[in-house]
UniProtKB/Swiss-Prot annotation:
Protein name as annotated: Forkhead box protein O3
One GO molecular-function entry: sequence-specific DNA binding
CDD domains assigned: FH_FOXO3 (cd20061)
Positions of modified residues (N6-methyllysine): 46, 149, 230, 262, 271, 290, 419
Species name: Homo sapiens (Human)
Tissue: Ubiquitous.
Effect recorded for residue 555 to A: Decreased phosphorylation by AMPK and impaired ability to transactivate a reporter gene
Effect of residue 179 to A: Decreased phosphorylation by AMPK and impaired ability to transactivate a reporter gene
Keywords: Acetylation, Activator, Apoptosis, Chromosomal rearrangement, Cytoplasm, DNA-binding, Membrane, Methylation, Mitochondrion, Mitochondrion outer membrane, Nucleus, Phosphoprotein, Proto-oncogene, Transcription, Transcription regulation, Ubl conjugation
GO cellular component annotations of the record: chromatin; cytoplasm; cytosol; mitochondrial matrix; mitochondrial outer membrane; nucleoplasm; nucleus; protein-containing complex
Membrane topology: Peripheral membrane protein
Length: 673
């Protein structure tokens, strides 16, 4: 203890050496040094009364300790030149030795000897003049209460947090409530740290912290002020945590919002219900998969994709008008797939009847069928029993054979599209039936194109042409009842047109093409079955309406969906007989039906509702090749070969029984797909 009076002289050089960058007081707060509290109490042993201020961290000392810090900085400038890095390092080593010895409870007097003995020779020589530093530690240890109290402050103003200060401010008010501005005023008035920080420049930081704590902690509640234009009151939440930090309020976001979760769940349920409803109401997909050679039996995913596509476009909003051209409607295919088209026909309808999809029930169309029955234009009349049988066939399950395959004959201006469950069809559907008057005066060929994966299509045709205006066709006395079949081919759903034209006769024709599902019938229903080994085509002919017997050679026929426009425009030039062939996955050919008195008539003599028949007053000349090249090839990049090929192979004779007319042969050119 005798060395205590001499301690101030050697202490100041040591403190100067430590102050510039290695001040011991900053280490506990920065958590970079495991500095013990006893060593903090021992190191700032100065005879002056500023021990408490010296033990503080510089940022906490603030303005009150500026004078002391300035004095130490001045002394550092005065002595810094003679110190050097070696002296600074020796001071640091001495501090480490003091830290090791002080917590161990050793005698302070033995500290310097131990520290000096444990150091190297060069460093020990530097520490010799500074060894009198540790003896004053007992004097500092006696008054260690104040330094400990000051150095344990959490914030610059003390141990209280912002939330604690706000709580005290609110509790100190008579009404136990304060506005935000009143809280600011209380801070400046009652907390010494904020006394000189009330102006706008220096108060931005701590005022923002107060606002943050008010919103963060659940112990504070905001109450609406009764007066208009006044800020809200902040009160202490009686249910909130009074001590410590309350749980934070989570901001409402897309992840934790219950409302969003519920709405998302409802949307998912609605979507699932919409998807399951068409599947349960109709077994058309199962019918499609039962076809052994059908392209739809390969992948149910493609069928599902087409089902979703048709459900999206099954509305008037998806079409411009009821008389939309098939060329324009074909652009809808591009929305679904670019490489492969959906395995379904493109269905067209007038504005009075939406285009139904294969995946939807057929019961909705029943009233419309009944209504349309009264507007049919029949040459020799269609009996009510036959119509009743036809309507009854709509609800037949796939396992039941169709009792009658009667064709529904009606005027040419209305195409009717039904669903995949089939109109009088056990395994397929009447996808489109268009009946129109036609003239039987001449024989006309028209190439019926079928699109298959951008492959060149070659069309075989017959050699008779005729020039007849649309007006003549419309006003013709001889009517032929023809039907158009929506057929399914592999790359594109081809729209096929089969001709069953008759004068003074009714007949029932059942046609079944494997990739094309139209007017399918069981093989035992007809009198003639022409089966292709590759496609399993069953085309049968039902009983005739009289004693007439029609023996037709039936084979595949397919049209692309866009061929209806081209063929309709050819009809304006009076196409009477057409020969076509389909390029699908397997072989395809052409079919020719003839019940005319003089010439066999092709069934594509129809006028779909796509054509505005009111605008034609005279003859209309159309160039089929230019139409296809401009509208079809430009859109899809298809390659067509219009070389007329008349092949003599696979020639099937067409026999017309009980009819006054010449027999004609239809030639079929089988081209591998």
């Amino acid at each position: 203890m005798a060395e205590a009076p001499a301690s101030p002289a050697p202490l100041s050089p040591l403190e100067v050496e430590l102050d510039p960058e290695f001040e011991p007081q900053s280490r506990p707060r920065s958590c970079t040094w495991p500095l013990q509290r006893p060593e903090l109490q021992a190191s700032p042993a100065k005879p002056s009364g500023e021990t408490a201020a010296d033990s503080m961290i510089p940022e906490e000392e603030d303005d009150e300790d500026d004078e002391d810090g300035g004095g130490r900085a001045g002394s550092a400038m005065a002595i810094g030149g003679g110190g050097g890095s070696g002296t600074l390092g020796s001071g640091l080593l001495l501090e480490d030795s003091a830290r090791v010895l002080a917590p161990g409870g050793q005698d302070p007097g033995s500290g310097p000897a131990t520290a000096a003995g444990g150091l190297s020779g060069g460093t020990q020589a530097l520490l010799q003049p500074q060894q009198p530093l540790p003896p004053p530690q007992p004097g500092a240890a006696g008054g260690s209460g104040q330094p400990r109290k000051c150095s344990s402050r959490r914030n610059a103003w003390g141990n209280l947090s912002y939330a604690d200060l706000i709580t005290r401010a609110i509790e100190s008010s008579p009404d136990k409530r304060l506005t935000l501005s009143q809280i600011y005023e209380w801070m400046v008035r009652c907390v010494p740290y904020f006394k000189d920080k009330g102006d706008s420049n220096s108060s931005a930081g701590w005022k923002n912290s107060i606002r943050h704590n008010l919103s963060l902690h659940s112990r504070f509640m905001r109450v609406q002020n009764e007066g208009t234009g006044k800020s809200s009151w902040w009160i202490i939440n009686p249910d909130g945590g009074k001590s410590g930090k309350a749980p934070r309020r989570r901001a409402v976001s897309m992840d934790n919002s219950n409302k969003y979760t519920k709405s998302r769940g409802r949307a998912a349920k609605k979507k699932a219900a919409l998807q399951t409803a068409p599947e349960s109401a109709d077994d058309s997909p199962s019918q499609l998969s039962k076809w052994p050679g059908s392209p739809t039996s390969r992948s149910s995913d493609e069928l599902d994709a087409w089902t979703d596509f048709r459900s999206r476009t099954n509305s008037n909003a998806s079409t411009v008008s009821g008389r939309l051209s098939p060329i324009m409607a074909s652009t809808e295919l591009d929305e679904v797939q670019d490489d492969d088209a959906p395995l379904s026909p493109m269905l067209y309808s007038s504005s009075a009847s939406l285009s139904p999809s294969v995946s939807k029930p057929c019961t909705v169309e029943l009233p419309r069928l009944t209504d349309m029955a009264g507007t049919m234009n029949l040459n020799d009349g269609l009996t009510e029993n036959l119509m009743d049988d036809l309507l009854d066939n709509i609800t037949l399950p796939p396992s039941q054979p169709s009792p009658t395959g009667g064709l529904m004959q009606r005027s040419s201006s209305f195409p009717y599209t039904t669903k995949g469950s089939g109109l009088g069809s056990p395994t397929s559907s009447f996808n489109s039936t268009v009946f129109g008057p036609s003239s039987l005066n001449s024989l006309r060929q028209s190439p019926m194109q079928t699109i298959q994966e951008n492959k060149p299509a070659t069309f075989s045709s017959m050699s008779h042409y005729g020039n007849q205006t649309l007006q003549d066709l419309l006003t013709s006395d001889s009517l032929s009842h023809s039907d158009v079949m929506m057929t399914q081919s592999d790359p594109l759903m081809s729209q096929a047109s089969t001709a069953v034209s008759a004068q003074n006769s009714r007949r029932n024709v059942m046609l079944r093409n494997d990739p094309m599902m139209s007017f399918a019938a069981q093989p035992n229903q007809g009198s003639l079955v022409n089966q292709n080994l590759l496609h399993h085509q069953h085309q049968t002919q039902g009983a005739l309406g009289g004693s007439r017997a029609l023996s037709n050679s039936v084979s595949n026929m397919g049209l692309s969906e866009s061929s209806s426009l081209g063929s309709a425009k050819h009809q304006q030039q009076s196409p009477v007989s057409q020969s076509m062939q389909t390029l699908s996955d397997s072989l395809s050919g052409s079919s020719l039906y003839s019940t005319s008195a003089n010439l066999p008539v092709m069934g594509h003599e129809k006028f779909p509702s796509d054509l505005d028949l009111d605008m034609f007053n005279g003859s209309l000349e159309c160039d089929m090749e230019s139409i296809i090249r401009s509208e079809l090839m430009d859109a899809d990049g298809l390659d067509f070969n219009f070389d007329s090929l008349i092949s003599t192979q696979n020639v099937v004779g067409l026999n017309v029984g009980n009819f006054t007319g010449a027999k004609q042969a239809s030639s079929q050119s089988w081209v591998p797909g």
